[in-house]
Amino acid sequence: MSLADLLGELEAAKDPEKAGPMEAYMRYQFPFLGIAGPERNALYRKYFLSAKKTKMIDWDFVDTCWEKEPREYQYVAANYLKAMQSYLTKDDLPKLERLVVTKSWWDTVDILDRVVGSLVANHPELEEVLLKWSLS
């Protein structure tokens, strides 16, 4: 059971009838597959449990998800990082910043703020970097 398999499951679960209203709700900022949150969560739960056993972040998976057009892939990446946040290191902060500012909208920022907050709580020396973010 690989994270790549999860991407295939997401594609198989797409529902074009639901995609339209989801796109409208997000003011047509992003295309959607039409997979609602509860269904999406059920799909990725088992993959994230398996991924935790590796005790390391798969940044290639995160980047692959972030580069895909449908918004659900960014949700998967952000929630993957939330599930794996205890394995983040302070060296991951620039990668997180890139996600926060790329394809940025309230929906993914609301997930990533918890991930960044957890990292900074574990590494208080990063607070200065967050202050710089707030000024940019």
Regions found by a protein language model. Name each.
Residues 1-136:
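Alpha-helical scaffold domains
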